[in-house]
Amino acid sequence: EPPLPDHPRVHVVHFTDAIGQRAATNVGAALSRAKYVFKLDAHCAVDEGFDVKLIQDCQPDWTMIPSMYALHAFDWKCCGCGDQTYQGFKPEKCIGCNGTEHEMVIVWKPRPQRYTISWMFDSNMQFQYWRKHSHRPEAQGDLVETMSCIGACFFMERERFLALGGMDECHGSWGQYGSELSGKAWLSGGKLITSKKTWMAHLFRTGNFSRNGHS
């Protein structure tokens, strides 16, 4: 792949070995001199002007997350008949013409029918969707307090992130990221807030992304 082009406002940090997203987030926050820190998984899309919309409402003791869609990242297009198959494992053959040649077509759009604003975790720190919460009166405004998040994306003042100790690298590189983030938000006296004024879309690599135990 070609190298990333230089930009005076972008600092690329290289590691010989993968260090995991907890450590990577900590390194980025430590190197930054910005007022805010925003963490986003690579397999995500964001709303235009998402940062400005979050800054307008962010309070010093808040951790904020955009409302979330599922991401329609790509389709598989049959090179023979042009039929397209929804993202996932590359089809072995086209169901329309039995052709075996396919090319990836980038879509990169949110799926409107897959929308979430609230999450929680159980007594085992296991992440859960909180579907019923979105119907409560307190969840009808543009800013909604939620118990947890999936951990793919968050926004807060950088000094608060550092004061909370960043992400706990002793807890592993990946698992329970959202549970740790949310627990630190409200156990420190702050809040975890979903903003409906903006959104992010996350690619969930489940379902037809898996075949014969591989994804």
List where the protein language model places each region.
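Glycine-rich, basic loop-to-helix element that forms the pyrophosphate-binding segment
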Residues: 15-32
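Acidic donor-binding segment of Leloir-type glycosyltransferases
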Residues: 1-15
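A short, conserved alpha-helix in the catalytic core of glycosyltransferases
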Residues: 54, 153-154, 159-165, 170-198
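Short aromatic/hydrophobic "clamp" motif used to bind/position activated sugar donors
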Residues: 37
